[in-house]
């Protein structure tokens, strides 16, 4: 029992570091003492996110060890509440927004083989004749995340604005497009990188300003652009950002073997075998003194 408590505390400290960043921290303190059985060590943790030292205590979800297998070295079970709280603090911290200069926007379209030379694109920046315009994407409200057997479902309102600069330094909006997007995502981890794949999506336009009947083609263009460019580009950027974050905390030092990320109704399961880095093994053995 002493060894199990030391090991649980050691893993807890390392795990908390991996999923914390700047003003966003996570409280994964034990909810009860670890349990040792004939086949495994089991520990239960809170999983409460802390933003700017303010924590939102949530009711602990029901968990049963029967939800896990017994053929892998390590299992992590996450309630969907943990992922939903992560989306909340990411929104509060202003991380769910993107700004692209006009040239960057055109380059993104080209990257995804979406012809950036169509006549409709100059019309989007029609008021920006002397200075380059900008495109901004942000969430006006916080996204929600749920776990289902088909994948992790992310629902979010999204606003896209095309801006052009004034001489006074302020920006004016030429076009605004608002919609609700629901995506179903599968995740995997390989070669020390996180990969996200889109298995399903739904788009519900809510508002399109400055668009009369003569410019209805702009709305159609934007809807097509979002499905063929917008969603894949955001997922690609999330892959890079999340991989960079977790590897900056040392996750890439572990030899993670055949990891699986499995979504089920109400929870997310990570199962894997792994090799312990020598320097962390030394740290752990020293902590036994």
From Swiss-Prot:
Belongs to the BPI/LBP/Plunc superfamily. BPI/LBP family. GO terms for molecular function: cholesterol binding; cholesterol transfer activity; phosphatidylcholine binding; phospholipid transporter activity; triglyceride binding. GO terms for biological process: cholesterol homeostasis; cholesterol metabolic process; cholesterol transport; high-density lipoprotein particle remodeling; low-density lipoprotein particle remodeling; phosphatidylcholine metabolic process; phospholipid homeostasis; reverse cholesterol transport. Expressed in adipose tissue, heart, and skeletal muscle and to a lower extent in stomach, testis, spleen, and liver. This is Cholesteryl ester transfer protein. Its main location: secreted. Involved in the transfer of neutral lipids, including cholesteryl ester and triglyceride, among lipoprotein particles. Allows the net movement of cholesteryl ester from high density lipoproteins/HDL to triglyceride-rich very low density lipoproteins/VLDL, and the equimolar transport of triglyceride from VLDL to HDL. Regulates the reverse cholesterol transport, by which excess cholesterol is removed from peripheral tissues and returned to the liver for elimination. Gene3D superfamilies: Bactericidal permeability-increasing protein, domain 2. It catalyses: cholesteryl (9Z-octadecenoate)(in) = cholesteryl (9Z-octadecenoate)(out); 1,2,3-tri-(9Z-octadecenoyl)-glycerol(in) = 1,2,3-tri-(9Z-octadecenoyl)-glycerol(out); cholesteryl (9Z,12Z)-octadecadienoate(in) = cholesteryl (9Z,12Z)-octadecadienoate(out). It is found in: Secreted. InterPro entries: Bactericidal_perm-incr_a/b_dom, Cholesteryl_ester_transfer, Lipid-bd_serum_glycop_C. Glycans are attached at residue 53. Induction: Up-regulated by cholesterol-rich diet. The gene is CETP. Keywords: Cholesterol metabolism, Glycoprotein, Lipid metabolism, Lipid transport, Secreted, Steroid metabolism, Sterol metabolism, Transport. One of its GO terms (cellular component) is high-density lipoprotein particle.
